[in-house]
Amino acid sequence: MLAKELGFNTASTMYVNNAYGQGLSQEFAKAFKAAGGTVLAEVPHEQVQPTYAAELRRALQGNPDVLLALSYPESANIYLTEAIEGGYKGEFLFCDGTQSIDLVNRVGAQYLNGTYGTVAGTAETDALRIFKEAYEAEYGELPPQPYIDTAYDAVVLMALAAQKAGKADGTSIRDNLRAVANPPGEVVGPGVDGIKKALDLIKKGKDINYEGAGGSQDFDEYGNVVTPIKIWKIENGQIVDVRFVTVTP
């Protein structure tokens, strides 16, 4: 529990009022309470508002040690700035939705340096390097947002499953995802060469095991791909990786 590890005993959340934000806030509150922390408030907000002053007053009542920004940058930009301008002296914690260098620049790195966040993590593997190099060659920059690598893997897996099935309908793709993503089979990776190899092996009737840019793509019994959680930090106005935490379903 990162919040307790950082010494926070009281917390409030500001979360975007949809399934994503609600789920994050509820799961954080449950884990924080189980670790001995006190949740002072869980405050929903709509995505597009000129001000979040009313919601912020509720979230900061009782002066929590930490305010969790469980939103998207366009909203968090506003309410974090309002919190700082209003004199809030506590800390902030971020999620994948607020892992944004644009947010850091808009709010001001001087206010956010030293703060932490979490995101589903991808270790630095050869597969990730191949993907990043290909992305940069095509777009002139490294992937700017979280989950671009995993979105890429999802598209590749659907294509490989369709090839394995010999059909491109939803049911056939679904039923062949594990056949191309999970062991056993020859390991194949992302990139033009990796995908060509995978397609050739499938055409020859061989089993494959796609290991993606976002890490292992093995589906568990519930159809989930479980990845490590990456803890990141804002240092000198930049977002830097700190460490990975293994998740046990």
Question: What are these model-derived regions, one by one?
Answer:
Residues 1-249:
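Extracytosolic ligand-binding ectodomains
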